[in-house]
Amino acid sequence: MQVSEILNSGLKREIKITVPAEDMEARLMARLEDAKNKVRLKGFRPGKVPLQHLRRMYGKSFMAEVVNEILNDSSRTIISDRGEKPAMQPEISMTEDEKEAEKVLAGAADFEFSLSYEVIPPIEIKDLAGIKITRPVYDVPDEEVDEQVKRVADSVRTYEAKKGKAEKGDKVTLDYVGKLDGEPFDGGSANDSEVVIGHGQFIPGFEDELIGLKAGDTKTFKITFPETYGAQHLAGKEAEFDVTVKEVAAAEELVIDDELAKKLGLESAEKLREIIRSQLENQYGQMTRQKAKRQLLDALDESYKFEAPSKLVEAEFNNIWSQVTRDLESAGRTFEDEETTEDDARQEYQRLAERRVRLGLVLAQIGEEASIQVSDDEMQRALIETIRRYPAQQQQEIYDFYRQNPQALASVRAPLFEEKVVDQLLSQVDVTDQKVSRDELLAEDEAEGEEKKAAGETKKKAAPKKKAAKKESAAE
């Protein structure tokens, strides 16, 4: 087998491989000899089939197997022997001339093919000294825990129907029809809808219009949808609503005690508070870690400047762009609504793709040198968490897909590996904790906003069709 380099420019490589006809013939004869003792042909005793007869029958198919074997096995070996790591699967090129291909399959010509690929550049890991990170830490006050406990407890609050007028805190059962320019609009109507006045379930102003109404009352009023409303065809528009109140119910006194906790499946009110505090601390702790991670990645981005493989960058950009445009389309928004242009957005996300690829390669190299591993148990837990996002009837099928598809499984492993590398780096750099307020912790800088959009965490999404009158949830 002869290997010659055709292209060596930057990270791009192209090599030509020639397997002499006599080598191909030897590989074919080895397969025929192996088949000789296995095939059963009428008129021949086992193991007595002449090789030439076998060749006439199976020669081309066996030679095709030899070609595939060389392409699959030799390609990896050749690149590895060159001391290179391909960024992606090499592109294989070989003759498209049918006559030439027939000669190869007949063992009458050399088998020639070429591999085109980009290499992962060598990365020399630098000293972490000098990287300083300020980690924002928010101490959850008792008042916030109390407020959240009340919200959770409110989910099991009972209401008693009353004859009087609706007040703030009352639950109103109603039918409504929303109209634009006198015509009902899609998703703007509902029957037997329940709303607790003051809870902010509906768009601003809607719940206030219900105050003072009694069961049996009807009312028509106008409300303007917020400019930032998720459904673009409703954003900023004035709509008219016809409302019929079916029932007004007053909230019974809410006492947060052990009995209420038991309704929630807990043994005591103290346990409820303990769980709520733990959830809040975990939630804010994740935000703290993400901001520390962001600073770490920014520092690494400044330290490591090298050419990233263009194919990896292209693939990353395509993933980002697909997510961004899909989210915009589902929200009924445009780049103008995001105060940018498509060209500017492309440039921004191209830079983000390059950054992600570079940092991914750096973290991979650091993890490799530190012998960081993702255990089977960690993979299993992550896989189970992944398939739980799918409907129950699909979960076994999804599980089997991941277990049988190495590339899909690698997509589960990659974020686990990255987080373990980040954890190790955070334990090695200079980290200073800084007490901050809740608002300061929740504040999002521009770079974080772009990352979230690229990850599909857009702030503005389309409202569910049957709830167009309702306000977007906090997550949206």
Curated annotation (Swiss-Prot):
Its EC number is 5.2.1.8. Residues 437-476 are annotated as: Disordered. GO terms for cellular component: cytoplasm. It catalyses: [protein]-peptidylproline (omega=180) = [protein]-peptidylproline (omega=0). It is found in: Cytoplasm. Residues 450-460 have a biased composition (Basic and acidic residues). Keywords: Cell cycle, Cell division, Chaperone, Cytoplasm, Isomerase, Rotamase. Residues 169-254 form the PPIase FKBP-type domain. Its main location: cytoplasm. Disulfide bonds: none annotated. Transmembrane segments: none annotated. GO terms for biological process: 'de novo' cotranslational protein folding; cell division; chaperone-mediated protein folding; protein transport; protein unfolding. InterPro entries: PPIase_dom_sf (IPR046357), PPIase_FKBP_dom (IPR001179), Trig_fac (IPR005215), Trigger_fac_C (IPR008880), Trigger_fac_C_sf (IPR037041), Trigger_fac_ribosome-bd_bac (IPR008881), Trigger_fac_ribosome-bd_sf (IPR036611), Trigger_fact/SurA_dom_sf (IPR027304). It holds the Pfam family FKBP_C. Consists of 3 domains; the N-terminus binds the ribosome, the middle domain has PPIase activity, while the C-terminus has intrinsic chaperone activity on its own. Belongs to the FKBP-type PPIase family. Tig subfamily. Involved in protein export. Acts as a chaperone by maintaining the newly synthesized protein in an open conformation. Functions as a peptidyl-prolyl cis-trans isomerase. NCBIfam families: tig. This is Trigger factor. The gene is tig.
